[in-house]
């Protein structure tokens, strides 16, 4: 059983504040939610279990029980998850406020301990102080957190997470902030709490405390497309697709890291809760993570033999050719932008090959093919430029004054001509490596200009950002029929 979840269940009965703050979906009536196989810790109840996606950010960080309340760590309502979430630079005073919140919600004194023990001793089998019956009293106060970086902002979700060695398929990683506070001060807080426990429970409390307060922080993970709802990933091929998210909001005017102080001002806290409401947003999927996901899907379907072929049709329209026909049944081709990029990239590459190398048919096996597989993955800049450089070297360039040149005297389509004029200013007959890189970047940037894209999607924005963008009608970036250049 998750210690934090058990503590919330038992402590919510001691007063009105706790009954409101410590209410978890996992301790209420179960409601069905989409089943998944993603393993990790639910940020709401801190138990390790199968996770489902959050309706506020579409990331997998909530269990199927807690999902009924739709709480997200990016919310603006001061529920327990939001009050445990800190942002960016965390100071010693912030951590002191967090510890004070824990002490307020999970008090430990002789009266509380006796009350829980008396309530638990219902049968003879419960007369001994066994850990399974008193799990809620064994919640130490630690500065253990799950952290994540979203477009330059780092979030720390504090809690008590059991079984730290279990499988973690979420983008969150364990971070210990005890060094920012003070180990000895935190020890003193926990030793005082531990002194009220029966001797048989003190050892277990101490073991739990030291294991969760002395661990080494993990390296922070990189957020990728697999961390978001499969429903979003499956619809990326639709250019007009918008993600629907809901956020729990209120008139919370505190600084982000000061929300935990509200439990000290009970009347003010309940006044803020009276303003609670749900806001709905429809946001664009445009970001580097999802763009890279789409380009990678298209990269797996590349037919490199087209660059040596004599087909009169565009690369995605070749049929009945064993070496060049692209499988158009994949949904990635439903996005006309991906199709346009693929056609123009391969039209340009074929013109380079035909202008510089004597290869007559697509059935031939050439070394250049192995470098073509990465030409769409422009998000991985180093790998992409390496593949372009290798392709350039396969064209047998001529070197003059330490600069290598290749010819461009083969026919190209009008789209590529427009890109050449836009990027170079004319349709050249001689190109350097830098020219080739610039042209191929321009072909991709016409639809997916990653230079000006945020890394993560808008679903990871805070309420303040979403409201500002919604006011300026920018939650949907642009009409799907208009390119980034336009």
UniProtKB/Swiss-Prot annotation:
Residue segments, region Zinc-binding domain: 42-79
Post-translational modification summary for this protein: The C-terminal region is phosphorylated by host CKII/CSNK2A1. Phosphorylation of the DSGXS motif is essential for host NF-kappa-B inhibition.
Major localization class: host cell
Motif extent (pLxIS motif): 480-483
Origin: domain of life: Viruses
Subcellular location: Host cytoplasm, Host cytoskeleton
Region annotation Important for cytoskeleton localization: where it falls in the sequence: 82-176
Annotated region described as Interaction with host IRF3, given as residue ranges: 317-486
GO molecular function: metal ion binding; RNA binding
Region annotation (RNA-binding) ranges: 1-81
Short sequence motif IKBKB-like degron (ILD) motif: positions: 479-483
GO cellular component: host cell cytoplasm; host cytoskeleton
Key words, A-Z: Host cytoplasm, Host cytoskeleton, Host-virus interaction, Inhibition of host innate immune response by virus, Inhibition of host IRF3 by virus, Inhibition of host IRF7 by virus, Inhibition of host NF-kappa-B by virus, Inhibition of host RLR pathway by virus, Interferon antiviral system evasion, Metal-binding, Phosphoprotein, RNA-binding, Viral immunoevasion
Entries under Pfam families matching the protein: Rota_NS53 (PF00981)
Alphabetical GO biological process terms: symbiont-mediated suppression of host cytoplasmic pattern recognition receptor signaling pathway via inhibition of IRF3 activity; symbiont-mediated suppression of host cytoplasmic pattern recognition receptor signaling pathway via inhibition of IRF7 activity; symbiont-mediated suppression of host NF-kappaB cascade
Quaternary assembly: Interacts (via C-terminus) with host IRF3; this interaction leads to IRF3 degradation. Interacts with host IRF7; this interaction leads to IRF7 degradation. Interacts with host CUL1 and CUL3. Interacts with host BTRC.
HAMAP family the record matches: ROTA_NSP1
Role this protein plays: Plays a role in the inhibition of host innate immunity by inducing the degradation of key host factors required to activate interferon production such as IRF3, IRF5 or IRF7. Associates with components of cullin RING ligases (CRLs) including CUL1 or CUL3, which are essential multisubunit ubiquitination complexes, to modulate their activities. Recognizes the host NF-kappa-B regulator BTRC through the presence of a DSGXS motif in the C-terminal substrate recognition domain.
This protein's domain notes: The integrity of the zinc-binding domain in NSP1 is important for degradation of host IRF3.
Family according to the record: Belongs to the rotavirus NSP1 family.
Protein name per UniProt: Non-structural protein 1
